[in-house]
Design a protein with these regions (language model features):
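DG-centered beta-turn motif at the end of beta-strands
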Residues: 1, 18, 90-105, 127-129
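Von Willebrand factor
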Residues: 1-45, 53-89, 94, 104, 130-135
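Phosphate/oxyanion-binding active-site loops and adjacent basic polyanion-contact surfaces
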Residues: 7-14, 64-75, 106, 164-172
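Surface-exposed acidic, glycine-flexible loop patches that form ligand/cofactor-binding
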Residues: 24-25, 79-90, 114-118, 185-188
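Extended hydrophobic secondary-structure segments that form protein cores and membrane-embedded regions
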Residues: 32-37, 93-99, 125-128, 153-155
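Von Willebrand factor A/integrin I-like adhesion domains
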Residues: 46-49, 133-182
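VWA/integrin I-like adhesion module and closely mimicked acidic/polar interface patches used
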Residues: 101-144
Length: 189
């Protein structure tokens, strides 16, 4: 469970490392956030005003319980926000942080969601943190049936062990080529 990573400061540290890159991509200086397990919750945006105590104030102090791991429900809600509610005609980079693979029954559903969204303006950058195995996410790059490759994955056992340059390079490894492919397919403008 990711509970220990919230309590020991790992997730707070990851947020602090990701915020600078998110600020470069976001138009309003805020990073939208969700917490997920079997279900999900939309959380208040992360910004320069609240990032330093975000995990404590918005997650641990609110008593969110961490259960199993299902990606598809939260991915559908993320897509709903960016494709229906906000309807911005700009590419969207999702930094999807997880501490482990999803449950078996969620894998085909997640495959379906990724395929369905492969002709939309959303790129999924999955980031595995901690000591878990990520066999499902490692196979994601070879998922067939997509209009274009709309997802990438890397794992970092300890986010403190890599430099900002290394982290940003990993985060943006496939995003520029996705932008080019999405433009050539008329998915984004």
């Amino acid at each position: 469970s990711m509970s220990s990573l919230y309590r020991d400061g790992t997730v707070q540290g990851v947020i602090e490392r990701l915020l600078p890159i998110a600020m470069q991509f976001d138009d309003n200086g805020e990073m939208e956030a969700w917490i997920f397990e079997n279900g999900f919750h939309r959380l208040p945006e992360i910004s320069l005003r609240n990032f330093d105590t975000y995990v404590q104030q918005e997650i641990t102090d609110r008593g969110y319980m961490m259960g199993g791991t299902q990606y598809a429900p939260v991915m559908r809600d993320i897509a709903k926000k960016y494709l229906q509610e906000d309807r911005a005609d700009i590419p969207t980079l999702i930094l999807f942080i997880t501490d482990g693979d999803n449950f078996s029954e969620d894998k085909p559903v997640t495959d379906k969601v990724i395929r369905e969204l492969s002709d939309k303006g959303i790129f999924w950058q999955f980031v595995g943190i901690g000591d878990a195995r990520f066999s499902y996410l490692e196979k994601l790059d070879n998922l067939s049936g997509r209009v274009i490759d709309n997802a990438n994955f890397f794992a970092v056992r300890d986010y403190r062990s890599i430099s900002d340059d290394e982290l940003y390079s990993l985060l943006l490894q496939e995003y520029p080529s996705w932008i080019a492919q999405a433009r050539s397919h008329g998915i984004i403008h």
